[in-house]
């Protein structure tokens, strides 16, 4: 008899434990990606990325949310992918940092984005009833993504993955277990 993974099905809420830098809320997110399988079951060079719907369902984006005081930036990025997209994987070296204007709050935020090489897609996840998740090729995702700064993060990832110097084994990665996020 196998042991199944237990997933905390509640997302963190509230802003009281959020990190700020010079008055700007710090948010972290990931561009979850995987290499597409060919018809014969082999891994191809084609990359797919996972986008999610906003909670109101009107826009597509990459998972992101507040960076809290009790976690590293990589843990926050991994937690957001679990909560919003229901995926686990290896958080890789930061893609960049962007200052952007929040459409809903009218204030500037600081966004840090990471690539996540997805290793597992869960059937149940905390925000499954308020978000859709869709795997797309890079071109489709770039067109569909609402936020300019997330499109730029996607461009950085594509450039990094297409670089002949790209050596995934040497890339700094961090895997976070589900237990540390609940």
From Swiss-Prot:
Keyword Hydrolase part of the UniProt annotation: yes
Domain Nudix hydrolase: from-to ranges: 27-158
InterPro entries: DDP-like_NUDIX (IPR047198), NUDIX_hydrolase-like_dom_sf (IPR015797), NUDIX_hydrolase_dom (IPR000086)
Tissues expressed in: Expressed in roots, leaves, stems and inflorescences.
Residues annotated for Mg(2+) binding in this entry: 80, 84
Molecular function via GO: metal ion binding; pyrophosphatase activity
One Pfam family this sequence matches: NUDIX
The entry's keywords: Hydrolase, Magnesium, Manganese, Metal-binding, Mitochondrion, Transit peptide
UniProt-annotated location(s): Mitochondrion
GO cellular component, one term: mitochondrion
Main location: mitochondrion
Transit peptide: 1-26
Broadest EC class assigned to this enzyme: hydrolase
Keyword Iron attributed: no
Cofactor section: Mg(2+); Mn(2+)
Residue numbers covered by motif Nudix box: 65-86
Record-listed E.C. numbers: 3.6.1.-
Family membership: Belongs to the Nudix hydrolase family.
PANTHER family: DIPHOSPHOINOSITOL POLYPHOSPHATE PHOSPHOHYDROLASE, NUDIX HYDROLASE 17, MITOCHONDRIAL
Function per UniProt: Probably mediates the hydrolysis of some nucleoside diphosphate derivatives.
Name of the molecule in the record: Nudix hydrolase 17, mitochondrial
Species: Arabidopsis thaliana
């Amino acid at each position: 008899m196998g042991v199944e993974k237990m997933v905390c099905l509640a997302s963190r809420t509230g802003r009281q434990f959020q990190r700020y830098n010079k008055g700007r809320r710090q948010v972290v997110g990931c561009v979850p990606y995987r290499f597409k399988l060919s018809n014969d079951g082999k891994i191809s060079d084609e990359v797919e990325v996972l986008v999610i719907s906003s909670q109101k369902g009107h826009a597509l984006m990459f998972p992101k949310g507040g960076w809290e005081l009790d976690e590293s930036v990589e843990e926050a990025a991994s937690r957001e992918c679990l909560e919003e997209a229901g995926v686990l994987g290896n958080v890789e070296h930061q893609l960049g940092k962007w200052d952007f204007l929040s459409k809903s709050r009218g204030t500037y935020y600081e966004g840090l984005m990471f690539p996540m090489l997805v290793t597992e897609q869960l059937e149940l996840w905390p925000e499954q009833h308020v978000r859709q998740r869709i795997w797309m090729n890079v071109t489709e995702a770039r067109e569909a993504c609402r936020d300019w700064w997330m499109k730029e993060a996607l461009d950085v990832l594509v450039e990094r993955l297409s670089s002949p110097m790209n050596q995934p084994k040497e890339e700094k990665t961090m895997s976070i277990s589900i237990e540390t996020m609940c």
